[in-house]
Amino acid sequence: MRQTKTGILLANLGTPDAPTSEAVKRYLKQFLSDRRVVDTPRLLWWPLLRGVILPLRSPRVAKLYQSIWMDGGSPLMVYSREQQQALAARLPDTPVALGMSYGSPSLESAVDELLASDVDHIVVLPLYPQYSCSTVGAVWDELGRILARKRRIPGISFIRDYADDGAYIDALAKSARESFARHGEPDVLLLSYHGIPQRYADEGDDYPQRCRDTTRELVSALGLPPEKVMMTFQSRFGREPWLTPYTDETLKMLGEKGTGHIQVMCPGFAADCLETLEEIAEQNREIFLEAGGKKYAYIPALNATPEHIDMMLKLTAPYR
């Protein structure tokens, strides 16, 4: 009997190819055209997206990308490639591919790369610790569309999420402790997760609960009193209500009431990107300090740390 050959597909959101208005416009058009991300009726959404949002947001977002761009490209791509390479180095007999829901390398190119390596089985690991229809659901949908066009379909194992996985929590706790050792223990550890529209949660998306699961386990692992940890949501977009409390408003409130030392961790981001390096590490730092806060530190994402790669090994082990 022929032994099954397994490959691993690491999936993430994606990034513009360059910090330019045109590249950002292409990326945002693909991203904001996904019904999993924005489910506004198309007759209403297309004119708004193409006539207002893309022309206005693309130049502004491009400038933000320029402020964090690295020699090797966008931070998300640099760190994602490092994750892929580090995992592949630990699994020399297992092909590891990287695919993005939007932009390049695409999920389809990652599937094709693995099939070209003659794999019979693909383990799909979306690098979103907390499930949401707008992230993990989008990977699932695109994977189905890709495979629907193939004559040869491999076996698929799909890891839905890992919000309360022990190795993930341990990696976060180690990162937080290292930050505490460097900057001192904060008055408040703020855990900022990417937001989603409140309506998505009302309609059944269990993302808020999975964020609470991560927060509960991390607080326990760190041994912090609950009153020293807050959970908030960032990166809201549009006018409808999103999950609350909002990160920026919470930081302003904490600064105004005299909280001196804040450290912020973003447990939902597997790799640093625009939303962490610019929005959290820069914009929200200014909000807190201008409101009266004294000390602010951003705790980096897990990126390609050994503990993060150990977690990927553990999560994929049952399927290899």
Curated annotation (Swiss-Prot):
CDD domains linked: Ferrochelatase_C, Ferrochelatase_N
Gene3D superfamilies recorded: 3.40.50.1400
GO molecular function: ferrochelatase activity; metal ion binding
Record-listed E.C. numbers: 4.98.1.1
Pathway(s) where this gene product acts: Porphyrin-containing compound metabolism; protoheme biosynthesis; protoheme from protoporphyrin-IX: step 1/1
Catalyses which reaction(s): heme b + 2 H(+) = protoporphyrin IX + Fe(2+)
InterPro entries: Ferrochelatase, Ferrochelatase_AS, Ferrochelatase_C, Ferrochelatase_N
Subcellular locations according to the entry: Cytoplasm
UniProt record, GO biological process: heme biosynthetic process
Keyword set includes Cell division: no
Stored Pfam families: Ferrochelatase (PF00762)
Any one annotated GO CC term: cytoplasm
Oligomer status and interactors: Monomer.
UniProt record similarity statement: Belongs to the ferrochelatase family.
Protein function: Catalyzes the ferrous insertion into protoporphyrin IX.
UniProt-listed PANTHER family: FERROCHELATASE, FERROCHELATASE, MITOCHONDRIAL
Protein name: Ferrochelatase
Species per Swiss-Prot/TrEMBL record: Salmonella schwarzengrund (strain CVM19633)
Record gene name: hemH
